Amino acid sequence: MSRYRGPRVKIIRRLGALPGLTNKTLKLKSGYINQSTSNKKVSQYRIRLEEKQKLRFHYGLTERQLLKYVRIARKAKGSTGQVLLQLLEMRLDNIIFRLGMAPTIPGARQLVNHRHILINNNTVDIPSYNCKPKDVITIKDRSKSQSIIIKNLNSFQKQKIPNHLTFDLMQIKGLVNQIIDREWIYLKINELLVVEYYSRQV
């Protein structure tokens, strides 16, 4: 299944707020009832499916990519669900988003693909690059790169930067301090349900 490129409002209307996908929010009219769930008994499968979809759309992954991360998480030590979230949060495109250098994860992915981003002074154009503690994230010293990032920072750096990251606004430089803690993953998600959804596929 390919990466979703359709209307983003349609997705958040069904799944709720997904800040990685879009910074838009829905204002529901008074008395609004979600027709997809009203007066219906929701199956356990559907509940797990929707949690999985939240994760996939928030981080902008294909089905194959998400399944790959689940398999990696299952082989690692610790809680599979927590390891899965940590793997996704430490992706370069997500780190750029969490630093406020892009309004959304798709926007961050575009910055990486267009070679605006440096990791430890080396150009990295792979959005799925796994960031590690002590990685230093900067931008290329060229006017186009500078203007894009500065515009994004002025517009979108409103939320608090999580404690596993540090950002120097004057130098436009980010630092990965550590692997993210679960409490700093602000997406409303039950990762256990995602793991259960994939239990027969891994």
Curated annotation (Swiss-Prot):
InterPro entries assigned: Ribosomal_uS4 (IPR022801), Ribosomal_uS4_bac-type (IPR005709), Ribosomal_uS4_CS (IPR018079), Ribosomal_uS4_N (IPR001912), S4_RNA-bd (IPR002942), S4_RNA-bd_sf (IPR036986)
Alphabetical GO biological process terms: translation
PROSITE patterns assigned: RIBOSOMAL_S4, S4
Lineage top rank: taxon: Eukaryota
Signal peptide: none
Key words, A-Z: Chloroplast, Plastid, Ribonucleoprotein, Ribosomal protein, RNA-binding, rRNA-binding
GO molecular function, one term: structural constituent of ribosome
Compartmental location: Plastid, Chloroplast
Pfam families, A to Z: Ribosomal_S4 (PF00163), S4 (PF01479)
NCBIfam families: PRK05327.1, rpsD_bact
Subunit structure: Part of the 30S ribosomal subunit. Contacts protein S5. The interaction surface between S4 and S5 is involved in control of translational fidelity.
Function: One of the primary rRNA binding proteins, it binds directly to 16S rRNA where it nucleates assembly of the body of the 30S subunit. With S5 and S12 plays an important role in translational accuracy.
Family statement drawn from the similarity comment of this UniProt entry: Belongs to the universal ribosomal protein uS4 family.
Protein name per the record: Small ribosomal subunit protein uS4c
Species per Swiss-Prot/TrEMBL record: Marchantia polymorpha (Common liverwort)
